[in-house]
Amino acid sequence: MGDTRVTVIGGGLAGSEAAWQLARAGVAVELVEMKPERRSPAHVLPGLAELVCSNSLRSDNPQNAVGLLHEELRRLGSLVLGCADATRVPAGDALAVDRERFSEAVTARLSGHPGVRIVHREVEDLPPPPALAVIATGPLTGDALAARLAEATGGRLHFYDAIAPIVAAESIDRSIAYARSRYGKGSGDDYLNLPLDEAQYHAFVDALLQGEKVPAHGFEEPRYFEGCLPIEVMAERGTEVLAHGPLKPVGLEDPRTGRWPHAVVQLRREDVEGTAWNLVGFQTRLTWPEQRRIFRAFLPGLANAEFVRLGQIHRNTFVDAPRVLAPDLSVRAAPHLFLAGQITGVEGYVESAACGLMAARAVLDRLAERAFRPPPAATALGALHRHLTGEAHPPGYDYQPSNVVFALFPPLTGRHRGKAGRKEAHVERARKELAPWIDTAPPPAVPAAG
């Protein structure tokens, strides 16, 4: 494979990880990074794999899904995790790093690898076939390249993500929530409904208007799509706007009263098993502490809500992965192109690095003319892959970026003692299932990072 050169576009965590995994398997890599020729508004440091803050890699505890992902990446010889461990700073069970030293370490390892050639220029067009390329240009992909990518994906490219909160099923008060689809359509248990009377509704709207918002960065001037407005922006347009929009009660009579409430918050099943529920239409720029406070205090049935994910809206270029990408992360309409990182719809630095590793493994399988072998579904890597393929989501799911969470994993079998017992069962199963997949990796040409 040493005579074959693969181009990796983007020197963030996904691109750096992909380049490393390819190079250590003996593939010649051209890593193209636009810095310092051009910087996005989020770039400050000169090197590769730039993080925005020291604790961006989050929890290192394997009882959390992202901590389990850390563990799996270490077992697979991840450059990102190796350099993170080498530049770690004390932060409890979080994997916090010295950002500058981390970026320098990643840059040094890649620039010092004989199989990696780093080129500094901005790419404005997609590489032509037949040579293989990994596109890992991140959430702030330049306009020219984004336009080419939109053409290649049939227009299924989004420029903002609008993420609504997700609540763990077990934390919803079922004595208040009731199952019903609008006008009784569907199976009847596709949605849970939280009824609000007029006083509760107005108190909730007031809390939304007064809640603290995340300030927009200079490159994130709020130009929202009318069909995907933040819930607080809708509230600003009039007291009853939400009651005629995402909280409209029409066709959702409360079985206890036989009448429509003044307003209804709908929760849609987020996974096939119903372990997590999405607050429909609740994309928001409220700060995360405010979301927890307001939704628990003012939404009936969510007083003890455990949030699997909190809402956000920000600039984020990403494709509709389940429809655009093949299972090996190649573009269906342009199979020589593989996507990796946040542009695929994974959220977070660790998830981006993991996606880069998966894309590299897919490229290696393509070069070896063998079928792609996805990570086992019950692993953290496999859960991310299930998200990208849509397997983790119910039919008709509106694809949005996601961190790795246990709700993306296949359901457990048997009985487990509480939430901690279920997490431990997920971890044990993932550890067991990852081992055979590790053994299928091509032998590295050089030692792994770390």
UniProtKB/Swiss-Prot annotation:
FAD binds at G10, G11, G12, L13, A14, G15. GO terms for cellular component: cytosol. Keywords: Cytoplasm, FAD, Flavoprotein, Methyltransferase, NAD, NADP, Transferase, tRNA processing. One of its GO terms (biological process) is tRNA wobble uridine modification. It catalyses: uridine(54) in tRNA + (6R)-5,10-methylene-5,6,7,8-tetrahydrofolate + NADH + H(+) = 5-methyluridine(54) in tRNA + (6S)-5,6,7,8-tetrahydrofolate + NAD(+); uridine(54) in tRNA + (6R)-5,10-methylene-5,6,7,8-tetrahydrofolate + NADPH + H(+) = 5-methyluridine(54) in tRNA + (6S)-5,6,7,8-tetrahydrofolate + NADP(+). PANTHER family: GLUCOSE INHIBITED DIVISION PROTEIN A, METHYLENETETRAHYDROFOLATE--TRNA-(URACIL-5-)-METHYLTRANSFERASE TRMFO. This is Methylenetetrahydrofolate--tRNA-(uracil-5-)-methyltransferase TrmFO. It comes from Anaeromyxobacter dehalogenans (strain 2CP-C).
